[in-house]
């Protein structure tokens, strides 16, 4: 009976420790995610100040064959690329939280799966493409990768496109490069 009591006490202590450890992990993870989201918002505010207020003036391109004239770009690519030369474009989707730099590593296709624009570990990672895609978006298909974060960052708000009314009112994705603005029409939204 005494051995059984010691065993039960040890089991209870172990369970309590596991619960405390799990709760601590969840709290720290949520704090880190929220800090990362604030950092991402600061990046958008610092380097892409002209996008959300409708003052975008970069040349709009919908086809590579169109001749374009270069005008002022709302994205400060010079400052961004001083931070990290892997930053090559910016994606913005109105009425979502998607307003981020796009990166591509020349060494590791999935580096930015779990690294921020400063190449530090980041649970939410960054928006990125792999080396098989050209940085000028001249490929027939360019795949951009990003997490579906519970805190609403990265590509989490793309779920809004499941709502037909939202979909019909928000039909465009804007991608900025240092020399042009590309506009893509959203023709379908589905869960993969």
Locate predicted features.
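Hydrophobic membrane-insertion alpha-helices, especially the h-region
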Residues: 10-25
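N-terminal Lys/Arg-rich, disordered targeting/topogenic segments
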Residues: 1-5
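Solvent-exposed, non-transmembrane regions of membrane-associated and secreted proteins
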Residues: 21-192
């Amino acid at each position: 009976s005494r051995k059984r009591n010691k065993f039960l006490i040890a089991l209870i202590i172990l369970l309590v420790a596991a619960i405390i450890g799990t709760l601590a992990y969840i709290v720290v993870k949520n704090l880190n995610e929220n800090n990362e989201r604030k950092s991402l918002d600061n990046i958008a505010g610092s380097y892409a100040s002209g996008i959300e207020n409708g003052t975008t003036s970069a040349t709009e391109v919908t086809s590579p064959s169109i001749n374009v004239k270069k005008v002022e770009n709302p994205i400060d690519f010079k400052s961004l690329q001083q931070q990290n030369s892997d930053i090559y474009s910016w994606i913005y989707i109105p009425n979502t939280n998607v307003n981020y730099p796009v990166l591509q590593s020349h060494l590791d296709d999935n580096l930015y799966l779990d690294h921020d624009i400063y190449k530090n570990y980041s649970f939410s990672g960054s928006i990125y493409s792999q080396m098989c895609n050209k940085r000028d978006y001249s490929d027939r298909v360019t795949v951009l990768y990003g997490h579906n974060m519970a805190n609403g960052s990265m590509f989490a708000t793309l779920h809004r496109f499941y709502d037909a009314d939202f979909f019909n009112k928000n039909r465009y994705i804007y991608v900025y490069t240092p020399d042009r603005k590309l506009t893509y029409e959203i023709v379908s939204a589905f869960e993969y």
